Amino acid sequence: MKQLKITKFPALDYAGNEAFNTLSTNLSFAGASVKKIMVTSCHAAEGKSYLSMNLMRTLAQRGIKVALVDADLRRSMVNSDYGLKYEDGRNDGKGLSHFLAGMVGMDEVIYQTDIPNAIMVPVGRDVPNPLALLTNSHFAELLDMLARMADYVIVDAPPVGVVIDAAEIAKACDGTLIAVNYNDVSRQELLDVKQQIEQTGCPILGTVLNQVDYDNYMGRKYYK
């Protein structure tokens, strides 16, 4: 298996560690049939990739085998934000888009990361109109293969409220986590996203709040 190094991965603080440990534990309550998990959001820049990457790391550190698929084929930021380095030292390499386009085989896009227990399928290159690639049978076949290799498959998808790609991705997944910026998304927007995902037959596992002032939030909760 090819090797992939993640060179920019800041450590979580205490509150962050506790939050991701809790989320990892809660995933186990979803049942053994829930293995392929899509992570999405209502808008761009709500932290879905942050959620995906840190959930991958937390699960792996707990000895759970996990695969991450970067499926944001339009404008992924994982390569640059997390400093992915491929075997030859390059900043880019073969990934999901290359496999779905039939340019390489499945084994060419599955990488062992430098985090034990964590494998990854990077995005490859941006695609202007990826819907045709996501609707072919190769995408579901890749997720099924990864589900045999790992305990969980985390799929970092585009925002539901921006493009239709995530709804197509959801059809191949067992459940969805929605990243939500605290006080930045309206109730109606969240309900619309919930409806779009549920129409695909993929259940909502829950929402994860980002950008929360933890001390202030817990203080208000305690004194109410």
Q: Where are the model-predicted features located?
A:
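Short, glycine/acidic-enriched loop or turn micro-motifs at the edges of active sites
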Residues: L73-R75, P159, D213
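C-terminal lobe/tail of nucleotide-utilizing enzymes
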Residues: M1-S33, Q188-K224
